Amino acid sequence: MGSDDLSTGDKIQKGFQINYMILRDADTGKVIWQENKDFSAPDLEHEARVPVKILDMRAVSREINFSTIEAMENFRLDQKVLFKGRIMEEWFFEMGFVGANTTNTWQSTIEAAPESQMMPAKVLNGNVTIQTSFYDNETLITKSVVRLYYI
């Protein structure tokens, strides 16, 4: 199978990788979690161990550093937070055009749910997954699942 036989999504996926992710307190800029791992691999469930204090923050700034071989016209992601498989929250982020053969850093701010909707860490621990679908326009590039553990 030559490269001409690959779908657009498959071509982008082959040359796409996450280099690292950083979560910061959006108010102070202080790093609360960092992982130098490619969370974009679709065939396994990833794990992240994040400090429990993240649940008390008003907002979190997420920084994703990624590399791509293929250009993307409208890079975006859909992110679902699931508790025991049921959707609790869903967010949509759009970055836009990404050039070929580039490494990019994308920062987004995620605001916490109202305190009345928050559950304790001991209930959430190991029961929350974040499902992130990466797209170029409507073409799915990859889908990542990360299970959260609070430490």
UniProtKB/Swiss-Prot annotation:
Gene3D superfamilies: GMP phosphodiesterase, delta subunit. Keywords: cGMP, Cytoplasm, Nucleus. Its main location: nucleus. InterPro entries: Ig_E-set, PDED_dom, PDED_dom_sf, Rhodop-sen_GMP-Pdiesterase_dsu. Belongs to the PDE6D/unc-119 family. PANTHER family: RETINAL ROD RHODOPSIN-SENSITIVE CGMP 3',5'-CYCLIC PHOSPHODIESTERASE DELTA-SUBUNIT, RETINAL ROD RHODOPSIN-SENSITIVE CGMP 3',5'-CYCLIC PHOSPHODIESTERASE SUBUNIT DELTA. This is Probable cGMP 3',5'-cyclic phosphodiesterase subunit delta. It comes from Drosophila grimshawi (Hawaiian fruit fly). The gene is PrBP.
